[in-house]
């Protein structure tokens, strides 16, 4: 497979690797981007890739809490200009409040909003503003108490990142602090039990290969038993601590894990939602000359 400059650029952006290292990784893996990331990591040339986070779409995430229930809704637009539009913001707020009454995105589209369905309201707003919009997803969470936080707030309850945290027990403010922590650290899951097993296994494979290659290149190689029973488990323990919410060091007090901070506050964190605008979406790229030609032809 031909390795293009764009492929090298994307790999460098996602891993922080040097240009020649990125090119070699893609060559060695026949252009497979995921395999190239793993190849770089086994060579110690890239950090662990967090869950897919390339953000290219515009829009807003809305969050809303009612008692022990919280919802997050993402609505995408084509441009950030529209995301700053008061009518668009009002629409997203309305969709978010409507989400409290339903359990999934299809039910939300059919939900009533001032005598019209959410879907009808969306289509009418598209016609007025003149830009395509998408009601992309919603998430709902519940507990004894739920706290919400928005990062890069555009208005009350609206922003580029929305977080919900559900706790068991009487919340004394810790849930909001944890929500802010989640916005910053982007954990993969609540606990080890909630992690995707394929993600854990992939990490184990990378760490095993890396440890074996480092040991083979060492002037004083360690016995295989040390690699298998000490080094690899130690690295996996670190991976789990860094990528699970309960295992992470609490940003507000790094002397405690999030689990320990919650316990001290007398609550148990039972779930969270972190929703970022455009997560996993790529904007359609168009050649500039083709774009100009298209504009002139139109």
From Swiss-Prot:
Region Involved in Mg(2+) ion dislocation from EF-Tu, annotated ranges: 79-82
PANTHER family per UniProt: ELONGATION FACTOR TS, ELONGATION FACTOR TS, MITOCHONDRIAL
NCBIfam families in the cross-refs: tsf
Keywords assigned: Cytoplasm, Elongation factor, Protein biosynthesis
Protein name in the entry: Elongation factor Ts
One GO molecular-function entry: translation elongation factor activity
Family to which the UniProt record says this protein belongs: Belongs to the EF-Ts family.
GO cellular component: cytoplasm
Cellular localization per UniProt: Cytoplasm
InterPro entries: EF-Ts_dimer_sf, Transl_elong_EFTs/EF1B, Transl_elong_EFTs/EF1B_dimer, Transl_elong_Ts_CS, UBA-like_sf
Keyword Protein biosynthesis set for record: yes
Main location: cytoplasm
Upper taxonomic lineage: Bacteria, Pseudomonadati, Pseudomonadota, Alphaproteobacteria, Rhodobacterales
The protein's role, per its UniProt record: Associates with the EF-Tu.GDP complex and induces the exchange of GDP to GTP. It remains bound to the aminoacyl-tRNA.EF-Tu.GTP complex up to the GTP hydrolysis stage on the ribosome.
């Amino acid at each position: 497979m031909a390795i293009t400059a764009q492929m090298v650029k994307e790999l460098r952006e996602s891993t922080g690797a040097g240009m020649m290292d990125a090119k070699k990784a893609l060559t060695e893996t026949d252009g497979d981007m995921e395999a190239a990331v793993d190849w770089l990591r086994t060579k110690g040339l890239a950090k662990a890739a967090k869950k897919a986070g390339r953000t290219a779409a515009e829009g807003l995430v809305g969050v809303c809490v009612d008692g022990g229930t919280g919802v997050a809704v993402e609505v995408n637009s084509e441009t950030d200009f529209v995301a700053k539009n008061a009518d668009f913001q009002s629409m997203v707020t309305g969709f978010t409040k409507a989400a409290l009454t339903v359990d999934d995105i299809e039910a939300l589209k059919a939900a009533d909003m001032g005598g019209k369905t959410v879907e009808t309201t969306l289509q009418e707003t598209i016609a007025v503003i003149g830009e395509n919009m998408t009601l992309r997803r919603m998430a709902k969470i519940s507990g004894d108490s739920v706290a919400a936080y928005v990062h890069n707030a555009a208005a009350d309850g609206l922003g580029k990142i929305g977080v919900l945290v559900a706790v068991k027990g009487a919340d004394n403010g810790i849930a909001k602090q944890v929500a802010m922590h989640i916005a910053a650290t982007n954990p993969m899951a609540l606990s080890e039990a909630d992690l995707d097993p394929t993600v854990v296994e992939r990490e184990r494979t990378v760490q095993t290969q890396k440890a074996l290659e480092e040991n083979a290149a060492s002037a004083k190689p360690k016995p295989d038993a040390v690699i298998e029973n000490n080094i690899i488990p130690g690295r996996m323990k670190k991976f789990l601590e860094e990528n699970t919410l309960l295992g992470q060091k609490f940003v507000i007090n790094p002397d405690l894990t999030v689990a320990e901070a919650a316990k001290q506050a007398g609550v148990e964190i039972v779930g969270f939602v972190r929703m970022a605008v455009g997560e996993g979406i790529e904007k359609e790229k168009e050649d500039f000359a083709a774009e100009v030609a298209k504009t002139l032809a139109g």
